[in-house]
């Protein structure tokens, strides 16, 4: 019984630690910009600023929305329209 309660406390502690280290989507990560006398790394542009592309966000698929007005019946009249030519 004592081992079980220790395991539960350990799992809950790990959950709290992992939640506190997560970065929310609304928060923007800032990268440190090197000084002028530092050499330009392979991941930095000559101007000192690095090219940082935004991370892809996950979003729900909208299956019920049709992408085209004329369905080519490749989706067996479901109406998804993903394979229709525009």
Curated annotation (Swiss-Prot):
Pfam families registered for this protein in UniProt: Hepcidin
Pro-peptide positions on chain: 23-59
An example Gene Ontology molecular-function term: hormone activity
Cysteine disulfide links: 68-84, 71-74, 72-80, 75-83
InterPro entries: Hepcidin
Keywords: Antibiotic, Antimicrobial, Cleavage on pair of basic residues, Disulfide bond, Hormone, Secreted, Signal
GO biological process annotation, one example: intracellular iron ion homeostasis
Leader sequence segment: 1-22
Subcellular localization, as worded in the UniProt entry: Secreted
CC per GO annotation: extracellular region
Keyword check for Translocase: no
Assigned protein family: Belongs to the hepcidin family.
Job description of the protein: Seems to act as a signaling molecule involved in the maintenance of iron homeostasis. Seems to be required in conjunction with HFE to regulate both intestinal iron absorption and iron storage in macrophages. May also have antimicrobial activity.
Descriptive protein name: Hepcidin-1
Encoding gene per record: hamp1
């Amino acid at each position: 019984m004592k081992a079980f309660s220790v395991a539960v406390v350990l799992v809950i502690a790990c959950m709290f630690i992992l939640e506190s280290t997560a970065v929310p989507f609304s928060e923007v990560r800032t990268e440190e910009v090197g000084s002028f006398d530092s050499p330009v790394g392979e991941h930095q542009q000559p101007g000192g600023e690095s090219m940082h592309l935004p991370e892809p966000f996950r979003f729900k698929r909208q299956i019920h929305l049709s992408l085209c007005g004329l369905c080519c019946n490749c989706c067996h009249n479901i109406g998804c329209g993903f394979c229709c030519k525009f």
